[in-house]
Amino acid sequence: TCSTTMPLRYSDFNFGTKLRQNEEAVSERKDWIGTEKERLNRLMAAECDGIITGLYEYWCCYQPFFPTKTTFIPFPIVVGDEPKIAPEPPKQLNLFIGISRNRSVYKGTDIMLRAAEKVKADYPERLNLKVVTGLPFDEYVRTMRGSDAIMDQLYSYTPSMNPLEAMAHGIICIGGGEPEHYALLHETTLRPIINVLPSYESCVSALTQLVTHL
């Protein structure tokens, strides 16, 4: 759907009405469109009694075709103990970026990293940047703790499991937090995510605003 009817302004597969042509997006389309995977997906969607979508993007793609059996249930997260947050803001922001091997361009962490490096160069005394690559989820979470903010999910309207885990530990998320996501949650007040558009300029602007207003 993201490659044909394109209900999203941007996604892993499109910018507006244009298909993304990066290697990962092209590979994903070849893997799904016109293949046994697609046929199985269509069969399951047609014959099942209900479709549970965990992200706005999934809901947006399934609901128009299956309006009576598509239900949105947000991804769950184990909150655990209340995070310990220092009473005073830090003098230097500890920013964490986790990079998945071979999916950096697809997920936009390449752009987020360039933006973070730019802000680090402009405000070296205000930003401490920690970058990790290819960590298993448990190790990712352990390494992320102690950070003040993370950058993740550039092409998403919503937070995935990594940003949700971060926020459960009191860590600021810079990434996907579009109004449509909050509307589906019926949330009219809280906006915990620093939303960025899928561009280098938007990431630089948002991070600069954060580090200069600690």
Q: Language-model features: where?
A:
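Conserved donor-binding/catalytic core segment of Leloir-type glycosyltransferases
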Residues: I73-K107, L113
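Helix-loop-beta element that forms the nucleotide-linked donor phosphate-binding surface
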Residues: N41-T53, Y58-I77
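Membrane-proximal helix-turn-helix segments that form the acceptor-binding/catalytic region
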Residues: G16-I51
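Short hydrophobic beta-strand element within catalytic cores of glycosyltransferases
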Residues: I172-P179
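Conserved active-site histidine-acidic residue motif and adjacent donor-binding/catalytic loop
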Residues: V132-T143, Y155-P159, P163-L164
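Short alpha-helical segment that forms part of, or immediately flanks, the ligand-binding pocket
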Residues: V141, P163-A168, Y182-A183, E187
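Acidic donor-binding loop of glycosyltransferase active sites
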Residues: R145-T158, I171
